[in-house]
Swiss-Prot record:
Record-level GO cellular component terms: cytoplasm; exodeoxyribonuclease VII complex
Protein name, entry field: Exodeoxyribonuclease 7 large subunit
Protein family per UniProt: Belongs to the XseA family.
Family annotation (InterPro entries): Exonuc_VII_L, Exonuc_VII_lsu_C, OB-fold_nuc-bd_dom
E.C. numbers: 3.1.11.6
Primary role: Bidirectionally degrades single-stranded DNA into large acid-insoluble oligonucleotides, which are then degraded further into small acid-soluble oligonucleotides.
The keyword Nuclease appears for this protein: yes
Main location: cytoplasm
Subunit description: Heterooligomer composed of large and small subunits.
Gene for this chain: xseA
UniProt-recorded Gene Ontology molecular function terms: exodeoxyribonuclease VII activity; nucleic acid binding
Compartments, as annotated in UniProt: Cytoplasm
Pfam families per record: Exonuc_VII_L, tRNA_anti_2
GO BP, one annotated term: DNA catabolic process
């Protein structure tokens, strides 16, 4: 029996005995092919199976399935003779709620967000020209080789690269990643990249670990999360200081190429020359204006003008002082005259006599014989009787 004959017999056997199956599970990987066919893996807690839903059948489905969807499929088991790979051929599909992984992811994301672990205020800035860069990933991974190759291509030789080996898949991966992160964070690095290439949802799920997220948040070193592909989002992306869609994108973000640096230096040189020329032109204009000024205003002439100005000011001051003296003399004369007038009046008033009758000042015309009056001067007082 040839492999083809065996595969054909197995295909017939599977299609005969597994032709009306209801299958439930969570999508862990999916490809929506350009032909219109859908190819995806359906998994439970322990196993997964390859599935296909051809265009004629999936046109009746009212939604586009995605990783994390929990589905209920109807269909049959078949075998692809060329490869001997068996798969489930779905004829109908409906959602059965969120899958376990997606539900865990969303619940943790919501909780950490409420705690403030994703708050932009806590994000640390990335260095402009890093000199000590750490990379946490599997030392045997293709992602690491791609990153190192890209650094070499950029000819960025300012930085020393430190590799911290860690598991990036499986149940033990979170512990391994945390251990590598703590070690790297104690080495006073300029920046740290946590990286992993693409994979299925469950392959990347170790980067949704809560303990890992909290270690990333409290790290002293700025951290870039570079996990999977553009469409892959994990908790470490949200809590890190910067999210790169791929490991290679992290290198592009962090490192300038030699050409970029040379072009930047050329641009800076050009701007400095423009600034220098501008300053020189300003100083030349200033010197020109000063030379014109001194040409028409020689130093002796300037000194003569200043002396004349000082003489004029002196004359004005003398004039003001003379006016003030005359004004003060006039005021003094007025005060002296007023004083003399008051003094004369006071001396004359000593000879005046005041006549009072019954406590009131009386005129001579009002007095009669036998009236008793009081005669008062400034120095004495006498009682008298009118005859």
């Amino acid at each position: 029996m040839t492999p083809t004959e065996l595969n054909l017999k197995a295909k017939a056997l599977l299609e005969t005995h597994f032709d009306d199956i209801v299958l439930s599970g969570e999508i862990s990987k999916i490809t929506l092919h350009g032909s219109g066919h859908w190819y995806f893996d359906l998994k439970d807690e322990r196993s997964s199976i390859a599935c296909a839903m051809f265009k004629g059948a999936n046109l009746k489905v009212g939604f586009k399935p995605a990783v994390g969807n929990f589905l209920e499929l109807c269909g049959s088991v078949s075998l692809y003779p060329e490869s001997g790979r068996y798969q489930f051929i779905a004829t109908s599909m409906k959602k059965a709620g969120f899958g376990d992984l997606e539900a865990q992811f969303l619940a943790l994301k919501e909780r950490l967000q409420k705690e403030g672990l994703f708050d932009p205020r806590f994000k640390k800035s990335l260095p402009k020209f890093p000199k000590k860069v750490g990379i946490i990933t599997s030392k045997t991974s293709a992602a690491l080789q791609d990153m190192l190759k890209l650094i070499h291509q950029k000819e960025y030789f300012l930085a020393k690269i430190y590799i911290f080996d860690a598991l990036t898949q499986g149940n033990n991966a979170p512990f391994s990643l945390i251990r590598a992160l703590k070690k790297a964070d104690d080495m006073d690095l300029d920046v740290l990249i946590i990286a992993r290439g693409g994979g299925s949802r469950e392959d990347l799920f170790c980067f949704n670990d809560e303990n890992l997220a909290r270690e990333i948040f409290k790290a002293k070193t700025p951290i870039i999360s570079a996990i999977g592909h553009e469409i892959d989002y994990v908790i470490s992306d949200f809590v890190a200081d910067f999210r790169a869609p791929t490991p290679s994108a992290a290198i592009d973000t962090l490192f300038y190429s030699k050409l970029d640096i040379e072009q930047s230096l050329d641009l800076m040189e050009e701007k400095l020359m423009q600034l220098w020329n501008y300053k020189i032109q300003n100083y030349e204009n200033l010197l020109l204006n000063l030379s014109k000024f001194f040409k028409f205003n020689s130093l002796p002439k300037i000194i003569d003008e200043k002396i004349k100005q000082s003489h004029n000011i002196e004359k004005q001051l003398n004039h003001l002082l003379a006016n003030q003296m005359r004004y003060n003399e006039l005021k003094l004369d007025k005060l002296q005259n007023a004083y003399l007038q008051h003094e004369n009046f006071f001396n004359k008033s000593k000879k005046f006599i005041c006549i009072r009758k019954n406590g009131k000042i009386a005129n001579l015309e009002d007095l009669k014989s036998d009236d008793i009056v009081i005669l008062s001067s400034q120095t004495s007082q006498k009682e008298a009787k009118i005859l």
